[in-house]
């Protein structure tokens, strides 16, 4: 068995703007990791208001803003330093007026409720970091419009990477990532009207949750 292992990532602790900027630069260089997410997002063809949960330095939000100028985004990020760097990044791209950065925790129900309703709520590579994913997903579902959609894109735990004895952030994330059956167990307690969980090649997990069946 290769049980889920929760390990602290050194990269998750951003001590100051310098560390946040370094992380942001690395994220910019590895845009290919978001390719599958952006392709699926395009196929969903959702207009209106988006909420990016765990927005980091705004790489994904900025890319979406450039491709979909009519979409209004709220970027929720736990780290104040990362959010500050994100604002710089968005200004450089010229999309700062399209995106509102908010510092806070997705597990904070009061904060999330204060953000309003969204046509799409998404997260990229954040699910495996949430201490209480059921609570976060439940809270996010309440912020969807009647036909809104929650899209979670993350790594998937696979045996052929799990056993590699590396302490890099990527391999720690692989060991801490969920598999399809575990996500199903999380969602069972929430009773969404519709959901789909897909294993994506080579080690990704795509989760779509609809508040209302269309």
Please give the residue ranges for each predicted region.
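Class I SAM-dependent methyltransferase SAM/SAH-binding core
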Residues: 51, 59-108
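A short glycine-rich, Lys/Arg-flanked "PGG" loop and its adjoining helix->strand segment in the class I
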Residues: 135-146
């Amino acid at each position: 068995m290769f049980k889920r292992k929760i390990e602290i990532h050194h990269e998750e602790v951003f001590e100051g703007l310098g560390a946040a900027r370094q992380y942001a630069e690395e994220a910019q260089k590895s845009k290919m990791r978001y390719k599958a997410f952006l392709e699926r997002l395009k196929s969903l063809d959702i207009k209106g208001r988006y909420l990016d949960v765990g927005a980091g330095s705004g790489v994904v939000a900025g890319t979406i803003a450039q491709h979909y100028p009519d979409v209004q985004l709220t970027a929720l990020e736990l780290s104040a330093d990362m959010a500050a760097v994100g604002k710089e990044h968005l200004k450089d791209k010229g999309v700062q007026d399209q995106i509102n950065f908010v510092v806070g925790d997705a597990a904070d129900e009061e904060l999330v409720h204060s953000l309003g309703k969204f046509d799409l709520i998404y997260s990229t590579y954040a699910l495996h970091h949430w201490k209480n994913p059921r609570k976060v997903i439940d809270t996010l579902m309440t912020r969807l419009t009647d036909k809104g959609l929650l899209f979670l894109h993350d790594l998937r735990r696979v045996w052929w990477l799990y056993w590699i004895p590396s302490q890099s952030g990527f391999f720690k994330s692989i060991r801490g990532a969920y598999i399809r059956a575990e996500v199903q167990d999380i969602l069972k307690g929430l009773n969404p009207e519709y959901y789909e969980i897909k294993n994506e090649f080579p080690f990704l997990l795509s989760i779509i949750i609809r508040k209302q069946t269309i």
